[in-house]
Amino acid sequence: MELLESALAKIQPVDEALLTEAQAKLDNKTKPPGSLGLLEEMARRFAAITGDLSPKMGKKVIFTFAGDHGIVEEGVSLFPKEVTPQMVLNFLRGGAGVNVLARHAGAEVRVVDVGVDYDFEPTEGLIIRKIAKGTRNFAKESAMTREEAVAAIEVGIALADRAKAEGISMVGTGEMGIGNTSPSSAIIAAFAGCSVREVTHRGTGIGDQALEHKIKVIQAGLDLNRPNPEDPLDVLSKVGGLEIAGIAGLVLGAAANRIPVVVDGFISTAGALIACEMHPNVREYIFAAHNSVEIGHQMMLQRIGAKPILDLQLRLGEGTGAALAMGLIEAGVKVLNEMATFEEAGVASS
């Protein structure tokens, strides 16, 4: 709990004056003011978050957190839980979607085992920080204890602290965990007070009958556990996931260390939402990578006040959207740093 409390105490609002100064710098580039649209918004936010009007773009890292889910026992996913460790091994071999898109973006992928029901051998690129071998079935009991939830959050915070020490310029979130759209739907339903049906979709591609079953299972879990929306740790521990907790910690740690954090899709945003509910200033450090096909994602983004960078009908997770968005954020930063001013170019300004 000490690491979590320390991180929360360090999170400060982003300096509004830096946002204004960064925009003034952009307005002096050889272009009409605001003509690069959202690229300029990304650039000024990146500068203000880092506290540097000429931010350096060094290493970019996507942390893909993996964990299993007891709720899979209820038949809410198209795939068995054995796919979770199989996909982790695919990540480590560099063969997954996130690996391909991260290579394209010039980002590194680090896989974090925070709760997979499998014993991995030590492998390059794999960070083993297992809190438990998956959550329990939240349709029958709490997904985890409060202590387990805090421990998983602190895994993410520690990784953000290490990223700061390494000089990493930008971090992204990703996840792998069969069944993890169910806890994500439960989390937003708990906070928003909406119906489960409004925030639950097909996940890995289940049919109509399976979707109806999934909605009933999630509702049963919420009715049983009665998570308190005023207590983010209560929501997380009762209906969440270990990888969702790890992501929440990474987002909190990034905010505490003034590192821009690119949040992927539905499951990653569930983690970011937990972080934002724990500290209101966290939202200022988040870049929402994209708008997911999962219907609950839009409600999450509205609640944290984040505008998605991309809308590509993505629903894979892993950090794929974060990898794509990182390239656009970096493009905005390059405009801020490399584009000539009117004076430098000998061009008359308005």
Swiss-Prot record:
The keyword Transferase applies. Gene3D superfamilies: 1.10.1610.10, 3.40.50.10210. The gene is cobT. It catalyses: 5,6-dimethylbenzimidazole + nicotinate beta-D-ribonucleotide = alpha-ribazole 5'-phosphate + nicotinate + H(+). Pathway: Nucleoside biosynthesis; alpha-ribazole biosynthesis; alpha-ribazole from 5,6-dimethylbenzimidazole: step 1/2. PANTHER family: NICOTINATE-NUCLEOTIDE--DIMETHYLBENZIMIDAZOLE PHOSPHORIBOSYLTRANSFERASE (PTHR43463:SF1). GO terms for molecular function: nicotinate-nucleotide-dimethylbenzimidazole phosphoribosyltransferase activity. It is an enzyme of class 2 (transferase). HAMAP family: CobT. Keywords: Cobalamin biosynthesis, Glycosyltransferase, Transferase. It holds the Pfam family DBI_PRT. This is Nicotinate-nucleotide--dimethylbenzimidazole phosphoribosyltransferase.
